[in-house]
């Protein structure tokens, strides 16, 4: 059983949703980013999505675009992101880490090298936003052969004809993007999310995590009553942007994570 399967199974047995947190690797700098990464599990993160900085993050809103820029300016590379995961795994063997980003940096790095190094580092899954199922042979197939889950995004515009194709080779969990548009956009209604999850359940037994537009503990709790996972990214990344120092960024991100975790964990009581 993979770390992702194990984590979602444990939480299902506990009767609660997972808090899935997103931060960009190397933001605001390597050391502070590693501190945040290492601190997230104790602050209540059940699964961590770690963004791989790329110069053209087209699916991301302003907050994550700026985070990517800060990370790149601080010298973050894909090799350093893998190193960050290796350092995280020295002390934490249980929290799943999913790398999220775009195909171009992986293609430049070399797919076979990337898959081997990601597996060795302790990466559990990949979310590659610009690589549709038609291109599975390029990365999804070798990643899954190495034991790395390949997580698909579904959206309000993914119709019933397309959905089985998207979900066919998905593993780990399904990431439902509750709002059409870029990250950090407005949030979806409870009714919309309820209907969307019911539709997805007709096509897959995988855990369903819902993200985009979730910023507060109250919003996180509302989604946690419905979904297997609640994804929060832009709200955490904003804390880094607003911080006056790297130390403050670490403190503020972990503080918000704790508040979100409280919302998620209390949602079904």
From Swiss-Prot:
Keywords: Amino-acid biosynthesis, Aromatic amino acid biosynthesis, Lyase, Tryptophan biosynthesis. The alpha subunit is responsible for the aldol cleavage of indoleglycerol phosphate to indole and glyceraldehyde 3-phosphate. Its EC number is 4.2.1.20. SUPFAM superfamilies: Ribulose-phoshate binding barrel. Gene3D superfamilies: Aldolase class I. Belongs to the TrpA family. Pathway: Amino-acid biosynthesis; L-tryptophan biosynthesis; L-tryptophan from chorismate: step 5/5. InterPro entries: Aldolase_TIM, RibuloseP-bd_barrel, Trp_synthase_alpha_AS, Trp_synthase_suA. Tetramer of two alpha and two beta chains. Pfam families: Trp_syntA. The active site is at 49 (proton acceptor), 60 (proton acceptor). GO terms for cellular component: cytosol. The keyword Lyase applies. This is Tryptophan synthase alpha chain. GO terms for molecular function: tryptophan synthase activity. Transmembrane segments: none annotated. NCBIfam families: trpA (TIGR00262). It comes from Pseudomonas putida (strain ATCC 700007 / DSM 6899 / JCM 31910 / BCRC 17059 / LMG 24140 / F1). It comes from the Bacteria. Coiled coil: none annotated. It catalyses: (1S,2R)-1-C-(indol-3-yl)glycerol 3-phosphate + L-serine = D-glyceraldehyde 3-phosphate + L-tryptophan + H2O.
